[in-house]
Amino acid sequence: MCTLNEKSKLDVAIDGADDVDTNLALVKGGGGALLREKMVEVMADKFICIVDESKLCKGLGPGFPLPVEITPFCHEHTVRVLENLPSIKGSCKAVLRMGSSSTN
């Protein structure tokens, strides 16, 4: 095992997803490690996502809340911007789920 700081590239990254639609678009990061997962995937030449049929859906969104990881810097502004996006204004509310704790 090694850390990502020790490698500049990975051959393959393997992970799961929270939701997968019929176009193979994914919702990931529901467990709270969105940024960490993305960093690993970006460093990999190949990304393999393994899911079972319980993760399949007709469209992303209704079955699983969209995870958005926000860093502490300028977090209040970021939440305001997200809450006021025209496509979701009034239909969603940002919920602080994990506070400032570190996960995974």
What do the predicted segments below correspond to?
Residues M1-N104:
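Conserved phosphate- and dinucleotide-binding cores of soluble alpha/beta proteins
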